Amino acid sequence: MSAGADRADGAEGADGRAGSSAAGRDFSAALEVAVEVAAERLQALGDSVQRDAALGAMTTYRVGGAAALFVHVTERGQLPIVADAARVSGLPVLVIGRGSNLLVADAGFAGLAVGLGELDTTIDIDTRTATLVASAGVALPVLARKTAAAGLSGFEWAVGVPGSIGGAVRMNAGGHGSDMAASLIEVLVFDLLDGAEHTLATSELGLGFRSSSLVARHVVLEATLQLDHGDAEKSARLISEIVAWRRANQPGGQNAGSVFVNPVPGEVSAGALIDAAGLRGHRIGTAVVSHKHANFIQVDDAGRADDVLALMTYVRARVEETSGYRLRSENRLVGFDDGGEF
């Protein structure tokens, strides 16, 4: 789950306007000029900057094209340099964490991709107050286990969720009856527009079911959570149950978790609607609706992102025909001409 599902395009210009990742994907003269400008501004970051960088390997779908320009950020102090490059060049920006909720078009992304990876994986737990501060790069399963071992409860649900804290905040990740909003107090973000850090309270994040008001220019740096005092052994048992359930009910392989948002959380699930439409196992090219869980799409080795989008489009149309519900993507779609349809 790396970033939010509220924008289908998944990227925008550093000025806050939506960026067209389709425009200039043939690496037009205008794009080349913008890339040159950004690359010059990023020179201080040396080998961390790469042109025509393949993005598929940075996602759990393992498919997708290249970014016109890519920079791997390894420390917070580099972010102002990235902000300057994005602002001056006008390139759309795509922030990539663990790539667990991201589908990049085969044609790629005509902009600046910023790879955070494990930028920072610090966890500071205060057992007295049951609060903690977790850096954006912390993996959700790691935090779930650490908090449980510390005798804190309320974050066990995250043990089976791929992705990091940064992406989880951006999309208000959740599962097993809870989500980030349930324990989130505030987040520290870096704004690529003004080049500064800002602390935002939960009320300022516009958190909804698998969505937030955070956009591409907002780089989540850390999150402060309020949990409950609990029993370490009880939490450990709950974690084991969640892990066992996920192994039994969700597929492995190349996928990005739940594809569509549940239309009515707690009442109407996307998976049930897809199943009722008879689409379990339905295939388009290299993409198939999982036999194990209908709200998962699995991709073959050397698969195509465009097949995934085609299957998503077909599934949504069939579900709307059979149930009247119009599904919304939980995955971030980047670089597709018609990605805005989701």
At which residue positions do the language-model features occur?
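Phosphate/pyrophosphate- and phosphate-bearing ligand-binding catalytic cores of soluble enzymes
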Residues: S2-G4, Q50-R51, T59, V63, ...
